[in-house]
A protein has these predicted regions:
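N-terminal leader/targeting and assembly helices and adjacent pre-domain segments
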Residues: 1-164, 286-428, 432
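Short, Φ-rich (hydrophobic/aromatic) sequence segments
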Residues: 1-21, 75, 79, 190-193, ...
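Conserved aromatic-histidine-acidic binding/catalytic patches
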Residues: 41, 48, 52, 150-157, ...
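Contiguous, non-catalytic segments that form substrate-binding/exosite surfaces or channel walls
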Residues: 126-213
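A general structural signal for short secondary-structure junctions and capping/turn motifs
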Residues: 167-169, 182-185, 207-212, 218-221, ...
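Acidic, glycine-rich two-metal-ion catalytic cores of nucleic acid-processing enzymes
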Residues: 184-288
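Compact mixed alphabeta submodule
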Residues: 254-305, 549-587
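Mono-ADP-ribosyltransferase
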Residues: 402-587
Length: 587
């Protein structure tokens, strides 16, 4: 006998592998989408889409082949574990009745039952995963055509259309196609296949045990939230042969052997041996009634255990959907050559990261209030990739990238609110800075010529007043690209060698002009020094000015610091003729 609680969770590790496969497929689709390029003449465009779809089909087949071995190993493991557990549970009942115990590894018959069900389930899962290639290819073509239509009608820009296509593909997720034409999510299909396979394997073992021992009665397990057609027979004793009139016949009453009956599709009920006169029923009528009682309170309403479980599953599905979107956006960011598309995807990534944080917080609160367990087994597994992007293993990890993006998004929203403090004159000064004023005013400051500086004094007074109203409410990290000569830590004309650059560690950088930074690494061409600056909570004198920037520079996500900005260099590394400096702003 396998307990309903065990059957609810035993496949989590396998489903984590499925989630990783889905993630890889979505990333592959996103890569193809961002490489489609601008909209071209229609017939040529269709040819490009079909070519991309063909390549994606091969991508998916490759991904499936990379993961199938791990999935097969996990299927074998869960079947073995469940088989041993099932017979151990049965042994307790048989020993109490004076019957001998049967162990899995000592029974050739039991091993054959297990092996047959393992083989059947592996074949079913393999066939289902292969159909994802067809469904993914179809989803890609649909997404491309929708994007093309949006751009051609003038309703959307190219960047927004592609970003929408990535979102739609990710939300749809990886799907499987059954021979009947029915379509399901890959994780749902795999869970159904392995749950049904493991449960039927245990049931066949139990009936074999009954046959060998001469026992003619079984008791079904019970759980809250059983479907109505199953609730009528759960937790009751039946006669297997149907010859004992004191008990209802097993097959006719439970529908065992049919998809809709006991141990059928997605069923978590099982059964165990029962010896009349010796065994004690596991479930009283009071216990069965309690399973359907509305005894759990949440937000001032009463719910059954089943209703709460469905509410939790719903929230978990939303979290997985958000993570799929993050995967799509992240892959697009890494693979696009378009700065505007990268900016659009980055903004969406940060927004979805914040949404993920809210969803996870809501789920944890729900579990805490209802006394349910917060499940994280599926959320902690990710694929390990080699240098060519092939899946070569699996590991456990927290999605740190999404965590940091969420924090960055929150910081940006807090800083946006600070712009409300600015006067109209100050807002105009900031906007002018993002245009031509930046070059003019900084040139005056760097020149040191009093006449040039005096000419800009009134403007700088207003700009300084605006920047003084900006205060960092939580630690942020900003980026700045420059060249060695602009670091202002060695005398003018000093030749910067690699050794000299390493000597910068521990030194303080001071910029006498205004300092433009960004929430993201823009990687300006011709600038071989990248500064990553940590700005502590409480720092005063900077504003996040994206919403005030002129259109040309809105995608830079600029954080502007007032003149005299100082930071201390903590670390410096060189990679491919580019220097990466980590620094900390000085309060």
């Amino acid at each position: 006998m396998l307990e309903p609680e065990y059957l609810e969770k035993f496949s989590d590790q396998l489903l984590a592998l499925v989630d990783a496969l889905s993630t890889a497929i979505i990333a592959d689709m996103s890569k193809r989408l961002v490489k489609t390029g601008e909209i071209t003449e229609t017939s040529r465009r269709q040819a490009e889409i079909l070519q991309g779809a063909g390549l994606l089909y091969k991508d998916v087949l490759k991904r499936v082949s990379q993961v199938s071995g791990y999935m097969n190993t996990e299927v074998e493991r869960v079947f073995e574990e469940a088989g041993v557990r099932n017979l151990k549970n049965e042994a307790v009942i048989y020993k109490a009745a004076g019957e001998k115990e049967i162990k899995l590894h000592q029974s050739e018959t039991m091993q054959k039952i297990l092996a047959a069900n393992v083989r059947k389930t592996k074949e079913e899962i393999n066939n289902l995963t292969l159909t994802t290639a067809v469904k993914t290819q179809s989803a890609y073509i649909t997404a491309c055509n929708k994007a093309m239509m949006k751009v051609q009608t003038g309703a959307f820009s190219y960047d927004k259309a592609i970003a929408d296509a990535i979102k739609e593909a990710a939300v749809q997720g990886t799907e499987v196609l059954y021979p009947s034409g029915h379509v399901d999510k890959l994780d749902v299909a795999v869970r159904r296949a392995v749950l049904t396979g493991v449960n039927q394997s245990a049931a066949e073992m139990n009936l074999q045990y009954v046959k060998e021992s001469g026992c003619d009665h079984v008791e079904t397990t019970a759980h809250s939230g059983a479907r109505p057609t199953h609730a009528v027979w759960q937790g009751k004793v039946f006669c297997v042969s149907g010859k004992d009139s004191r008990y209802p016949p097993f097959y006719e009453s439970t529908g065992y052997g049919t998809g809709a009956g006991l141990c059928g599709w997605n069923c978590r009920h099982n059964f165990h041996a029962f010896f009349p006169g010796i065994s004690t029923p596991a479930y009283s009528q009071e216990m069965l009634d309690d399973y359907s009682a509305r005894k759990y309170e949440y937000n001032s309403k009463k719910y059954t255990e089943y209703e709460l479980s469905q509410m939790q599953r719903s929230q978990e599905r939303k979290i997985r959907a958000t993570k799929r979107k993050l995967t799509g956006y992240d892959a697009g960011i890494k693979n696009t050559d378009s700065n505007t598309l990268k900016a659009e995807l980055t903004n969406r990534f940060e927004s979805e990261s914040a949404e993920l944080k809210k969803q996870e917080k809501s789920l944890k609160k729900f579990c805490r209030q209802t006394g349910r367990r917060y499940e994280s087994a599926r959320t902690q597994v990710h694929a390990v990739l080699d240098s060519e992007g092939n899946i070569v293993g699996f590991n456990k990890s927290v999605a740190q990238k999404a965590v940091w993006a969420s924090k960055r998004h929150t910081s940006k929203m807090q800083m946006v609110k600070q712009l409300d403090k600015l006067s109209d004159e100050e807002r105009l000064a900031v906007q002018r800075y993002t245009g031509f004023a930046a070059h003019r005013v900084n040139r005056a400051l760097y020149s040191g010529k009093s006449q040039m500086i005096e000419k800009e004094r009134e403007y700088m007074k207003v700009l300084d007043s605006a920047l003084d109203k900006g205060v960092i409410e939580r630690k942020i990290v900003v980026h700045r690209d420059t060249i060695p000569e602009f670091l202002n830590v060695f005398p003018k004309g000093f030749k910067y060698s690699e050794h000299d650059m390493e000597r910068l560690v521990g030194k303080t950088l001071t910029n006498i002009g205004y300092t433009s930074t960004s929430f993201r690494d823009i990687q300006y061409g011709g600038r071989n020094v990248h500064l990553e600056i940590e700005v502590p909570k409480g720092y005063r004198g900077c504003l996040y000015i994206e919403s005030l920037a002129i259109k040309k520079y809105k995608n830079q996500q600029e954080v502007l610091f007032k003149r005299g900005f100082r930071c201390k260099i903590k670390n410096i590394e060189k990679e491919n003729d580019r220097y990466y400096i980590k620094a900390e702003a000085i309060l």
